[in-house]
Amino acid sequence: MHDIKAIRDNPQAFDAAFTRRGLAPIADSLIKLDETRRAAILESEKAQARRNAASKEIGDAKKAKDNARADALMAEVAELKTTMPALEAAVKEADEALKKALSEIPNLPLDEVPEGADEHGNVDHHRFGAKRDYAFTPKAHYDLGEALGMMDFEAAAKISGARFVVLKKGLARLERAIGQFFLDVHTGEHGYTEVNPPLLVRDDAMFGTAQLPKFREDQFQTVTEEVRRRTIVEFVSSAMKLGASATDAGGSEFARQLANEELVDFSYAKMPERFWLIPTAEVSLTNLVRESILDEKELPMRLTALTPCFRAEAGAAGRDTRGMIRQHQFTKVELVSITTPEQSKDEHERMLSCAEEVLRRLGLHYRVMTLCTGDMGFASQKTYDIEVWMPGQGEGGAYREISSCSVCGDFQARRMDARSRGPDGKPRFVHTLNGSGTAVGRALIAVIENYQQEDGSIAVPDALQPYMGGLKVIAK
């Protein structure tokens, strides 16, 4: 969320940064919404002030036994009492319109972020290691996993449909080992505090980290059947104005049938009992400081969690339809930092190095890309993507994203009202950062494809062998 005062004070600078994302200037329209809001507030405050003054004048008139003036003032107060709800409603409407507009526009890129329209504008920052040489043609992880009898997409489809997998035996254990290894390094060496957060969160948590409202269709939501039906009945009843004809049994019955037939898109209805399945532990971890004022002596605060993550991937039809690259459910180790504004730049570099370190210890070749303005995430000011080499992808292998490390400035903090208090005692918004440390499922793919052997077995990286009971090779 952006500061409307900063936009008012320097609209040209705001638009200059905003248009670097390939978007049209927007400062003028935001300022107009703010002017409407401020005018509505002024009218409401003037009416309230006049009502207060008139009420006092009534007492003075009565003391002076000026009944005519007292009657006129009472009539004025009565009229103000009638008109004020409309003025207050206008304030609320204008305020919500501005907040809605601000909530739907992305963060501004830092000046150092390279300009570009899409992923082709990303810049190769640095690389680690080299591609492995094989005396055979490397296979894809799904071919290897299915041949081992440890990766079952058909069984998953029977249970849950497409984009799910059942892992068994050695590969199930290997995935667990990877997650535990990542956590141990981040907590034992990198100073992160392990958290076991909720996987189901409410609307305001998703809004705080900016998954809502823009990316609603990419998320899974859950609500009880009772609440769903009640909400639809209330929604339809209100829409049909059935309250004015409560005896209209036919109308009420229609609403009930509509709820049962699931004919209403209720995703935008007010549903306080709805939950969202987290698309990343960033949501749960970052919202731990929502509506808080932290002591800056406690910052930076570093948190990590190993959780399942859930994504509908509504915009991914036809992409990565085979294998585990793009799943509705996957496991990920998340890194979150809460910092002061002065700390966030250095913390971003530190977070990247923490994510890199676990991949280095697995002996995986990767490259780090600085995302351009047209490819960075909605809430990000600057993002590094780590792309790991997967020799079984496509023709001759491919780099695939395994981690994104982003600094968000105070963009999320404003949405969450997360602040800190420094030595001067004045509260200010914190800065938030998040990164994958890393995606466990994709790390599993990278290990399978990079450590495959000609007979189809998988060598276990040295760093993971203690987590595998000393097992060195996963074989059929």
Curated annotation (Swiss-Prot):
It is an enzyme of class 6 (ligase). Pathway: Aminoacyl-tRNA biosynthesis; selenocysteinyl-tRNA(Sec) biosynthesis; L-seryl-tRNA(Sec) from L-serine and tRNA(Sec): step 1/1. InterPro entries: aa-tRNA-synt_IIb, aa-tRNA-synth_II, aa-tRNA-synth_II/BPL/LPL, Ser-tRNA-ligase_type_1, Ser-tRNA-synth_1_N, SerRS_1_N_sf, SerRS_core, tRNA-bd_arm. Pfam families: Seryl_tRNA_N (PF02403), tRNA-synt_2b (PF00587). GO terms for cellular component: cytoplasm. One of its GO terms (biological process) is seryl-tRNA aminoacylation. The keyword Transit peptide does not apply. It catalyses: tRNA(Ser) + L-serine + ATP = L-seryl-tRNA(Ser) + AMP + diphosphate + H(+); tRNA(Sec) + L-serine + ATP = L-seryl-tRNA(Sec) + AMP + diphosphate + H(+). Its EC number is 6.1.1.11. Signal peptide: none annotated. Catalyzes the attachment of serine to tRNA(Ser). Is also able to aminoacylate tRNA(Sec) with serine, to form the misacylated tRNA L-seryl-tRNA(Sec), which will be further converted into selenocysteinyl-tRNA(Sec). Belongs to the class-II aminoacyl-tRNA synthetase family. Type-1 seryl-tRNA synthetase subfamily. PANTHER family: SERINE--TRNA LIGASE, SERYL-TRNA SYNTHETASE. Homodimer. The tRNA molecule binds across the dimer. Consists of two distinct domains, a catalytic core and a N-terminal extension that is involved in tRNA binding. This is Serine--tRNA ligase. It comes from Rhodopseudomonas palustris (strain HaA2).
